[in-house]
Amino acid sequence: PPGSLEELVHDRDGPRIIIQDPRTSTPGLGLLLWMRKVFGTDDQAAWTALAPRIVTVTKGWSEAYGLFLKGEAPMVLSYTTSPAYHRQVEQNNRYQVAMFSEGHYRQVEVAARLSTSSEPQLAQNFLRFLLSDTVQNILPTTNWMLPSVHTGQGLPDAFRDEEVPERMLQFDSLEVRDQRKQWISRWLTALSR
């Protein structure tokens, strides 16, 4: 696999890839932000360079990963924790993460209490429950993600072999809020050429 996002984008003979739409998918949005973080204002040119090897852009992760598992492309935008699922559930070590030298964009699943909630205390209690050891200990093998907080239990064996990105990339949330529409527009323009 490619060793960097730069290599993935600019290697004309590189692997074909399935990605998700940043308008409908948080991993797709993560890729959009990742490209912007690595390539800056050259992101549109990077998307144009990658476009010929994009097999399809799916609405969500499930559709993309399903196509990948059916052999539609040798590479898919997924989570660094995806191989743990295959190791634990299928006893299959075939699937690997492509670690990129520039770093990886941080994917965070969120839960929040709305200011307009009619049950603010119930919502707060639920958020506390989500952060409890009970829930955090089951997340790795139910949602196949790393927990938000460390618990005394540690991670299941399937995660012990996981490669962890050395560098995590992330934009300030206010910048994403202010620039997202423009960045998506640039993505649409690049992929429609």
What does each model-found stretch correspond to?
Residues P1-A73, H86:
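Extracytoplasmic ligand-binding site segments that recognize negatively charged/polar headgroups
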Residues P15-T24, W47-A51, V57-T58, E90-S115, F129-Q153:
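Periplasmic-binding protein-like
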Residues D43, S148-R193:
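An extracytoplasmic/periplasmic, membrane-proximal ligand-sensing/linker region
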Residues L69, A73-R94, N143-W144:
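A ligand-binding cleft/hinge motif common to bilobed small-molecule-binding domains
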Residues E6-V9, R36, Y65, L69, ...:
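Non-transmembrane alpha-helical segments in soluble domains
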Residues R36, Q107-P120, I138-T141:
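A bilobed periplasmic-binding-protein/Venus flytrap-type ligand-binding module shared by bacterial periplasmic
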Residues R23-T26, T81-A84, G103-Y105, S118, ...:
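Solvent-exposed loop/turn segments at secondary-structure junctions
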